[in-house]
A protein has these predicted regions:
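Eukaryotic scaffold repeat domains enriched in small/polar residues
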Residues: 1-115
Length: 115
């Protein structure tokens, strides 16, 4: 049994148990409230952990956005048989409705595994 620390607003979880050592993917939200808006090292990201809670990788950027390597609000995760990662995002509620003018944003992205 272990306790995993140093996560900010985890909102998505996928446990890959297809290998001998399970890997856990966790989607985190970035700062969105006045109380944490200026806090350092928070970001909209996907972290990958081993079964003991050691972070193996971090995907994403400190800033939310639609550019390559950025997330808006990861809320759903899935991994296919090739190892590609699918990230579902709550982009309208978190960001799109607040833009001037409001607009639709990406709500699903695929991250292709490179061999």
């Amino acid at each position: 049994e272990t306790q995993w620390n140093n996560m900010h607003r985890p909102c998505a979880l996928y446990m890959d148990t297809t290998k001998n050592d399970p890997v856990c993917f966790i989607g985190e939200l970035g700062p969105g409230f006045g109380v944490n808006k200026e806090a350092p090292n928070l970001g909209n990201r996907v972290d990958i952990y081993d079964k003991k809670g050691k972070r193996l990788a971090r995907l994403g950027d400190i800033h939310a956005g639609e550019k390559a390597g950025q997330f808006i609000a990861p809320h759903g995760l899935a991994i296919d048989s090739r190892g590609d990662i699918y990230v579902g995002e709550v982009s309208w509620t978190i960001m799109g409705q607040h833009l001037k003018p409001p607009r639709e944003l990406r709500s699903l992205q695929k991250l292709k595994k490179l061999n």
